[in-house]
Amino acid sequence: MVTVETGARLHFGFQNLSLAHPRLYGGVGVGLEEPRLVVDVEQAGTVECDDGAVEPYLRAVVEELGVEGARVTVRERFPRHTGLGSGTQLALSCLTGVARAYGLEPRPRERAPQLGRGGRSGVGVATFERGGFVVDIGHPTARFTTDPPRQGNWTVPPVLGRWTLPGDWRFVLVTPAGEKRGPSGEGEDRRMRTAVEHADPGIADEIATLLTRK
C-alpha cells in the first residue's frame, strides 16, 4: 500500500489577466501543511474508491498510466470549491499513489494537463511538488483567447520563484458552515472570460512591480 499526504494551497491571484501582455495569468500562492489530504492507494483489478469526488480523477489516472485499476481510500481531506485547491491535490495524489503502487514514475508536472490541472495557474502543481510561496510565469498569451484551451492542450507554467516561509508564519482559514461553494467548472470559466475581457494592463504592471521589487 502507498500513502500520499499533501496540504491545501492558498491562491492569492494572478499577475496579469490582460491579453495586451505577452504572458497571461501567472499564479501567485502558497502551500499549507494543513488542512491536508491523505490517501491510501493499492493495486486493484478495477477502479475502486470510497469517495465519489475522487473517482473521476482516479479513472483518469488509471487511463493515463495504462494500468489495470487501483483502490483509493481517503483518510483525510479538506472541502471542495472553497479556494483551497482540492481538485489539483486530489488529482495529483491519485496520480502519485497509483504510479508508485505500480512502480512507475508519477511525473505530476508532465501529466497534470491530462488530468485537467494547470490550465491557468501552476501554483497547485508547484506546491504539490515542493510547497512554499510560489510565483509562476503564466502561459504565452499568443496561445490563448478568453476561452480555455482544450483539456490537456497546455503545459503547466514553469515556476518563476519559490521561497520557503518562516517557520513561525501562520494562516488563519475561516470557511462558512454548510454546503456553500465557490465557482467551478463552466461558472468559473465564464467569470474568468469576463475578467480577461475587461482587464486593465496597467494593473498587471503594478503587480509585477510589487512581486519583483518589494
What are these regions (language model features)?
Residues T6, R36, D51-E55, T88, ...:
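Electropositive phosphate-/nucleotide-binding environments in soluble metabolic enzymes
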Residues M1-T82, R100-P106, G119:
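ATP-binding N-lobe of GHMP and related small-molecule kinases
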Residues R59, L92-T96, A112, T212:
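Predominant activation on well-ordered alpha-helical scaffold segments within soluble catalytic domains
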Residues T3, G7, F14-N16, G69, ...:
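Amphipathic, alpha-helical segments enriched in basic
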Residues A20-R23, E110-K214:
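ATP-dependent small-molecule kinase catalytic core of the GHMP/sugar-kinase superfamily
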Residues L84-R109, V125-P140:
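DPxDG-like acidic metal-binding loop motif
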